[in-house]
Amino acid sequence: MAIIIDVEHYGGRRAYLAHLRARVLYAMGSYDWVRQIQWSAVRRVAFVCQGNICRSPYAGGRARLHGISAISFGIQTVDGSAADPAALRNAFNRGVDLSGHRAARFDKSLIAPNDLVMVFEPRHLVEIVRQGVTAGAGITLIGIWTKPRRPHIQDPYGRSDRYFQQCFSEIDLYIDALAKRLAEHHAPAGAAVMGCHSEVTSSLKNASSE
């Protein structure tokens, strides 16, 4: 019996192929280094995607609902851009308000020594390494901390509401897993990553105004 793959579940045919390639590289150990996280050192989580208008702001918003201090950036974005309308709508339907979000371009100077940097695709790792980022707590792929492992989370920008919901649903699972790991390494749960909330807000404002 033939196995039918719903490629839209991954964001389309090209996205599915990117997913397969990332899975193979992960299985070969190419991303073993991104599992070396100092969880007890984490004081803030920096989510990084491509444009900082869909995935990373949603992840940041969801993380803050868990009491996690979080900030988000884009590898290629225009500082001050609002969240994508489709992201805004689909996030709102899931209880995350992105109406006040303004995009900020990623720069290593904005990463603090105790930040955990979480990205959505292997190509984001390439750019972060190119910039010489040294995040004390670690740099990792958001989708490798649950099963099945998903080293590549396709950008929902320009795609259907169905895929937006699929993507955001997966991010919810990743943030749940993140919250549990942080709670295991900090007592009381989440306290250690909530202390720099004002610093996060200040960093966002400064990044958006540059």
Task: Name what the model sees in each region.
Residues 2-39, 128-197:
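Phosphate-binding/catalytic loops
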Residues 53, 163, 170, 202-203:
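A generic structural signal for solvent-exposed, polar alpha-helical segments
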Residues 119-120:
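Short beta-strand scaffold positions
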Residues 123-125:
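Alpha-helix capping/helix-boundary segments
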